[in-house]
Amino acid sequence: MMRLACASPPSYGESAEQGSAGESLRPETALATARATPGKALAVPNDPALPGCALLHQSELRTKVTSRLLANWLGPNEQLLESSAVPWRYVPGKRCNFQLELVIAPAPGAAVECRRVIGKLYAKDHGAKVYRMLQDFRSHGFARGRFLVPQPLAYDAQWKLLLLTWAEGELLRSLLLGDSDVSERIEEAAGWLLKLHQCGVTRGPRLTFRRHLQTLAQQKQRVGEVYPESDGLLEDLLRRIEGRGVALSGWTSRPTHRDFSPDHLVFNGGHLTALDFDEFRHYDPMFDVAHFMAHLRLLGLRNSGAMTRFDDEAERFRVAYQAGAREYSAARLRLYQAVAHFKLAYILAVVVKPPAWKEAVDAFLGEARQVL
């Protein structure tokens, strides 16, 4: 059989946030992004904790499994001829995201077509939960119209494999770094988030502030191990975050993305698709607002050395969100800004360690202290 390859994708999809040197700024190991260097060999994980890793290494098995799972998505006369898998994000022992390129014969005698879907491999059954969550979102207004989520195509319990539709378009991150006017895009991002918080989805896992504090305490310990000079400030911040959070309790949990950032928003014409719902929980909606604003700070720092580069965009986002919010708290926003800056300090110190990482950690911890 003649081998056919899909064309290289433009800058869209679930790429990990990249710094100027291309390293991941998330607590994960990035194997590739939607803009991987042409011709560069990409490492393919062989993780015994991920049953589906075999599908990344065995082409015939992958094509057979994919063909079965996508039988309802493919047309009645369509045949999947072959497939290729390009990993781009890997969390050892937890999950691996990859681009699945499909070569399809639409009908006997017709020219073959190339299509893409998203594949996600999990260690446990979290993919089944994500599948159900996306179904819930789509039944609550995210299947059509201006604001969207990917369509979940299939989940296989044996391989712990989730398949999703590919999101065409441009990442907000790319638009921001392109120095174009993104004012309307920023407001649309706020609109998507408002719709999520108000969509009425009730099913899914829940997060408490106490559990969130436990995660921060673990991150504090890890940062202290590699940067002991920061331990006193970390301890003080954690104590102040706890006190402020207890004082501001009483909020109502809503559906929250919990990883809402410019890396997970894809624009295509009049549509905006949000990606990556692995961290979804019912939680305080103000956390999503603060998380997005903090990641604009990170984007500015890592790509221009100026943490404040996108502060105008962050303020535009906040104002747009507040204008449409049914319930808004400036005090809780400041609390979660401190939390988000605390987390980013952890990522920079423990996960990424870019050049001058201590200065970057100090900057984010300083921001956390300032907003509390």
PLM feature segments, named:
Residues 287-325, 339-356:
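Active-site activation/catalytic loop segments of kinase-like enzymes and analogous catalytic loops
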Residues 61-86, 201-258, 323-325:
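An alpha-helical support segment within catalytic cores of ATP-dependent transferases
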Residues 157-182, 195-202, 216-229, 298-299, ...:
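A glycine-centered beta->alpha junction motif in the catalytic cores
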